[in-house]
Amino acid sequence: MVMDVRNIEDVAPVVEHNGTVPVWWMVKSREMKEMTDGGFLELVNEFEVAGGGYVDPHSHPTHEFYYVLRGRGIMTISGEDRPIAQGDLVHIPPDAVHSLRPVSDNASIHCFCFAIGVKGSGPIDYTNH
């Protein structure tokens, strides 16, 4: 599996809404339709990992997305490490073991997160991994 990380700087804006709003399509309309067909919006949140902290390795049956609002970190998905920074959108496939840590003990990483649940999956306890 190749880690899917997209940066806002690599996306050209398209003017939408009758020429009034520039839109940066990080994931184009219907691009992930087949992959997420029958899914549902599982969650939307914002989180911050303090310098020196980390998100424990864990997995769940969702397509999860982290959008980095500020800071820098090391994202690990299925054993692959990759640096991420402000403007990056990371796709974490269902059941992929993943974790995140800031690059520094002195600076945090702050992310917006949302997940698409997989059809037929049961409830997930996000507080216990």
Question: What is each of the regions a protein language model found here?
Answer:
Residues 79-95:
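Short acidic-glycine-tyrosine-enriched beta hairpin
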Residues 1-41, 125-129:
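A short, N-terminal "cap"/entry segment at the start of jelly-roll beta-barrel domains
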Residues 46-50, 59-75, 116-117:
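Short, conserved beta-strand element in jelly-roll/cupin
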Residues 27-33, 44-60, 94:
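Conserved short histidine dyad/triad with adjacent acidic residue
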Residues 47, 91, 106-124:
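A short hydrophobic beta-strand segment most commonly corresponding to one strand
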Residues 56-57, 75-76, 92, 98-105:
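Short beta-strand His + acidic residue motifs that chelate non-heme Fe in jelly-roll/DSBH
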